[in-house]
Amino acid sequence: MGDRLTGLHAPTTEAGAASADHTAVVRPGFRDTAKAYVEVTKPISVGLLAFTAAAMMVVAGATHPVSGWLFVQALLAVVLACAGANAVSCYVDRDMDAQMGRTRRRPVPSGRISPPARALYWGLFLFVASLGLAWNLNPIAWITLWGGMLGYVVVYSLWLKRRSVWNIVIGGVSGGMPALFGWAAVTGEISLLPVLIAALVVLWIPNHIWSLAIFYREEYARVKVPMLPVVYELRRALNWLLLTVVLMVVFSVLIYFVGDWGLVYLATALVMGAAALALSVHIYRNPERRKAWVLFKFSSPYLAVLFLSMMVDVWLR
């Protein structure tokens, strides 16, 4: 776990001098370098957000024709956009990441991508590639993708992350943009349903991040990142966390009444929502780090299963 940090032991003078000469000529192989450049994009995070976009394309495709090429092009665009945003964010956060046990082994602080500016250039390259693909779709899709990247990198990473306790609430708006993009890529417009679904993702983000911040509370405090559970007394922070989970579940049910859904989505929203509420109430009544970890580990499957149920519901019509 993150609270078990291992130290780095200095070598003896003789061994250190000998190993210095030896390691000075060692170069990482292509495989290790490629792995580092993939890792800096946070592929698991990219996969989840891209999945929300793919699900929205399937949902929109129930009433609008979707070619295979459009689907692939849009999916590739959102993958590159999210990957680019994460790579730039890792460059911005390199000093903070180097001080946290959870993040110090990331490619930039660990030196696997060096100099650090290479992560920045890699992210910017992915930005440009994603915007080029989105431009071939339609203007609304391009704007939502551009807005999502700017929101994450500029509003969250550069501006709010180290300045405001509400960093993830405001900056989290960018997390809903892939869902909006998926809908816009197919329809060329934005309507109430995709806005509500994007809002659901935005409400999911505080639950996801704050539960992690509770578990790593001491580390966030040490690097002076004002996450709400770090700045506020824990009970007050849990009040806000529980509120966002309640709103998230309410929105998931509201989406059923706004869209043309069947019982698959409704049943999934109710069951997964009940589980999210139960875990949140559990930690609210008895605040413990391990319960925060359980809530964090549940949050990603919650979102993935909910969006999967949207696609299954459409396929079964």
UniProtKB/Swiss-Prot annotation:
Reaction equation(s) it catalyzes: heme b + (2E,6E)-farnesyl diphosphate + H2O = Fe(II)-heme o + diphosphate
Keyword Nucleotide-binding in annotation: no
Similarity field: Belongs to the UbiA prenyltransferase family. Protoheme IX farnesyltransferase subfamily.
Function per UniProt: Converts heme B (protoheme IX) to heme O by substitution of the vinyl group on carbon 2 of heme B porphyrin ring with a hydroxyethyl farnesyl side group.
Membrane topology: Multi-pass membrane protein
Keyword Transmembrane helix: yes
Pfam families in the record: UbiA (PF01040)
Compartment(s): Cell membrane
Other observations noted: Carbon 2 of the heme B porphyrin ring is defined according to the Fischer nomenclature.
GO biological process: heme O biosynthetic process
Record-listed E.C. numbers: 2.5.1.141
NCBIfam families found in the cross-reference section: cyoE_ctaB (TIGR01473), PRK04375.1-2 (NF003349)
Gene3D superfamilies: UbiA prenyltransferase (1.10.357.140)
Protein name, UniProt field: Protoheme IX farnesyltransferase
